[in-house]
Amino acid sequence: MATAEMEKTTTFDEAEKVKLNANEADDEVEEGEIVEETDDTTSYLSKEIATKHPLEHSWTFWFDNPVAKSKQAAWGSSLRNVYTFSTVEDFWGAYNNIHHPSKLVVGADLHCFKHKIEPKWEDPVCANGGTWKMSFSKGKSDTSWLYTLLAMIGHQFDHEDEICGAVVSVRGKGEKISLWTKNAANETAQVSIGKQWKQFLDYSDSVGFIFHDDAKRLDRNAKNRYTV
C-alpha cells in the first residue's frame, strides 16, 4: 500500500464525529429522552467498518519505561505491550494517541514490531539478525519515525520479509531510530533495506548495520558490518 494512500485514509475517529454531528442536528429533545441513531448515521458507520484497509501483517507497539528500567535487573523486563493493530485506520488511531519521540522522556524506547515478535535479541526471529541505525538531533526524529513506520507497515521494502520492526530511542544528546532485520548474514538483503530506508527518509548521512551477535559480545565496541 502506497504511503500517500495511507496518509489520506479516513481514521475511525471521524466516524464518531459524524455520529455526534448527526445527533446534534436532530430536533431538541426532552431531558432524559433517548435519541435513536438515524438511518443515515447507521449506514455511514457500517460503511466505515466495512471499508477498513487491512495491512499485510499485524503490528504491535511496545514501550520501554525508563523509570522501570532503572529498577529492573533483567534487560527487557520493563517492556510493555501497548497496542496491536492490523488495519490502516487502527494504525492512525494508535499513532495519534501515542506520544511522538520529541515528547517522550529521556531514556524511553518506543518500538513497533510485527505481531508476536518481541523487540529483544533473544527473540527467535531476531536472534540471527541485526540493526540499521540513524541518529537525529534532539527533538528532530518525529517525521523520520513516522516515515519509518509507514514504510514498514505499508510493505515498501523489497525485502519486506526481512523486517522485524523498528525502535526510536530518546537519549540526552538526541534520538536514534533502529531498524531491526532477521538475517544479518544476508548482505544483499540488508544493504538493499539500508539504501531504501535512507531513500524513504531522504537521509543524507551514512548509516551502519551491526549484527546482534557483535552487539551482545562487544557492546559499544561493536563495529558496522555494512555501511550505506
Curated annotation (Swiss-Prot):
Displayed sequence is allele pvr2(+), haplotype B1 found in strains cv. Doux Long des Landes, cv. Yolo Wonder, cv. Flambeau, cv. PI187331, cv. Cuba 3, cv. Bousso 1, cv. Pimiento Morron, cv. H3, cv. Lamu, cv. Bastidon, cv. CDP04928 and cv. Antibois which confers sensitivity to potato virus Y (PVY) strains LYE84 and SON41 and to tobacco etch virus (TEV) strains HAT and CAA10. The allele pvr2(2) correlates with resistance to pepper veinal mottle virus (PVMV), especially when associated with the pvr6 allele of eIF(iso)4E. Plants harboring specific haplotypes couples for eIF4E/eIF(iso)4E are resistant or tolerant to potyvirus such as potato virus Y (PVY). It comes from Capsicum annuum. MRNA binds at residues 71-76, 103, 121-122, 171-176, 216-220. This is Eukaryotic translation initiation factor 4E-1. Gene3D superfamilies: RNA Cap, Translation Initiation Factor Eif4e. Changing residue 213 to H: In allele pvr2(11), haplotype H1. Changing residue 51 to A: In allele pvr1, haplotype I1. In allele pvr2(21), haplotype P1. Residues 24-33 have a biased composition (Acidic residues).
